[in-house]
């Protein structure tokens, strides 16, 4: 079974176009890099063979400080309120996003910090005030990722699931939510009246010191339409294993949606990096992780993905549950030597509409260090960076 799956991945890799670059491409290829911090246990590998660890502030502090040392542009944390179970208890143990990122804002100085708001759990006026507070802590380096919520048990357990019709109305809800945020961040006052929210001389002060960035991760048509109108950039999943440009149609859809609103909303693409000295050594690690897939946790994810029957077939959760590479929730996976991974990331940068990547690693601390020391120096799209100091991250 593993042999046939490997062959399928090789076919995908061989079919992917290989791009060549010239010096004149270098400026156009400048691409931002972020780290998707492991706010939940075990990061993004649903495998008994992957590193097993609990999320702590100290771990995430070490990760983000190391990322800042290696000139990463931003750090993002998700929010997860209930996990997948299984042998690995995958994502059963999670920190909270805003409080974690407030702490990380206080121990960093340059890197942009993003927290995720589960908008069903927090009124927009509270998020507006929390964001303004972290803006003050960070010196203007904070932004907010807005999510509508797809995993019904996260909200049912608290008695706040609004009913299954929410699946088809969630971006209507989010549209009102962000309008309240923009009112409060812009003028400090909101009298917004809508179907979901009613503000009556609602006040928030002080306002953020800089315009607050809002990001989203919409891949459905409704999600992209929302991002086109309100987001500063939009996250999307990479696709496949060693097929770095396979997400290009998604980026093109986002670009087209943004053009219809007269805005520029770039795509930031999610990838996992599994690197080693040679392609074969990296591939061996990937095969080892797949062999230990936590089938019980993966079955739970598949079950949850089938509960939303109203949002279409192009949602994030349906890609996460696809059996092709479910062991890491089907984010794009780059497996190879340091040079191979650098080349593939340069290919990502050459896709129209792609402005950045959000990276995860099989082992975050060693992975970020290896990326900073061995991969990033080989990337054309990061050639603009200053030389590293000799300080240990």
From Swiss-Prot:
Underlying gene: rutA
Its EC number(s): 1.14.99.46
Pfam family, one: Bac_luciferase
Keywords for the protein's UniProt record, in alphabetical order: Flavoprotein, FMN, Monooxygenase, NADP, Oxidoreductase
Gene3D superfamilies per the UniProt record, alphabetical: Luciferase-like domain
Function recorded in the entry: The FMN-N(5)-oxide reacts spontaneously with NADH to produce FMN. Requires the flavin reductase RutF to regenerate FMN in vivo.
Name this protein carries in UniProt: Pyrimidine monooxygenase RutA
Origin species: Escherichia coli O6:H1 (strain CFT073 / ATCC 700928 / UPEC)
UniProt KW Transcription regulation keyword: no
Keyword flag Transmembrane helix: no
Factors inducing expression: Up-regulated by the nitrogen regulatory protein C (NtrC also called GlnG) and repressed by RutR.
Residues holding FMN: 79-80, 145, 154, 170-171, 220
A single GO BP: uracil catabolic process
Reactions performed catalytically: uracil + FMNH2 + NADH + O2 = (Z)-3-ureidoacrylate + FMN + NAD(+) + H2O + H(+); thymine + FMNH2 + NADH + O2 = (Z)-2-methylureidoacrylate + FMN + NAD(+) + H2O + H(+)
GO MF annotation list: alkanesulfonate monooxygenase activity; uracil oxygenase activity
Recorded superkingdom: Bacteria
UniProt record similarity statement: Belongs to the NtaA/SnaA/DszA monooxygenase family. RutA subfamily.
């Amino acid at each position: 079974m593993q042999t046939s799956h490997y062959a399928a991945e090789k076919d995908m890799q061989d079919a992917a176009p290989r791009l060549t670059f010239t010096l004149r491409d270098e400026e156009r290829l400048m691409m931002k890099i972020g780290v998707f911090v492991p706010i939940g246990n075990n990061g993004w590998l649903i495998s008994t063979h992957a590193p097993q660890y609990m999320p702590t502030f100290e771990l995430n502090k070490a990760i983000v400080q190391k990322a800042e040392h290696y000139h990463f542009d931003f750090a993002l944390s998700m929010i997860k309120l209930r996990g997948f179970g299984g042998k690995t208890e995958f994502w059963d143990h999670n920190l909270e996003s805003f409080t974690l990122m407030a702490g990380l804002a206080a121990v960093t100085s340059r890197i942009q910090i993003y927290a995720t708001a589960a908008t069903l759990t927090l009124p927009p006026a509270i998020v507006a005030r929390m964001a303004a507070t972290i803006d003050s802590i960070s010196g203007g380096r904070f932004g907010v990722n807005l999510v509508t919520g797809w995993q019904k048990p996260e909200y049912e357990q608290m008695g706040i699931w609004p009913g299954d019709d929410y699946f088809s109305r969630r971006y209507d809800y989010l549209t009102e939510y962000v309008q309240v945020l923009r009112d409060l961040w812009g003028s400090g006052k909101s009298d917004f009246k809508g179907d979901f929210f009613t503000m009556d001389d609602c006040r928030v002060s002080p306002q953020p010191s800089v315009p607050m960035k809002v990001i989203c991760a919409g891949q459905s048509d409704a999600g992209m339409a929302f991002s086109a109108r309100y987001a500063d950039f939009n996250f999307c999943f990479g696709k496949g294993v060693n097929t770095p440009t396979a997400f290009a149609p998604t980026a093109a859809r986002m670009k087209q949606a943004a053009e219809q609103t007269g805005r520029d909303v770039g795509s930031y693409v999610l990838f996992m990096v599994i690197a080693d000295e040679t392609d074969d050594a990296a591939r061996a690690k990937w095969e080892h992780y797949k062999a230990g897939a936590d089938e019980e946790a993966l079955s739970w994810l598949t079950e949850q993905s089938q509960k939303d029957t109203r949002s279409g077939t192009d949602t994030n959760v349906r890609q996460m549950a696809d059996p092709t590479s479910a062991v890491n929730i089907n984010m794009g996976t780059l497996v190879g030597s340091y040079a191979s991974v650098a080349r593939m990331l340069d290919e990502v940068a050459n896709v129209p509409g792609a402005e950045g990547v959000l990276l995860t690693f099989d082992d975050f601390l060693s992975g970020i260090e290896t990326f900073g020391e061995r991969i990033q120096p080989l990337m054309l799209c990061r050639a603009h960076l200053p030389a590293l100091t000799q300080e240990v991250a």
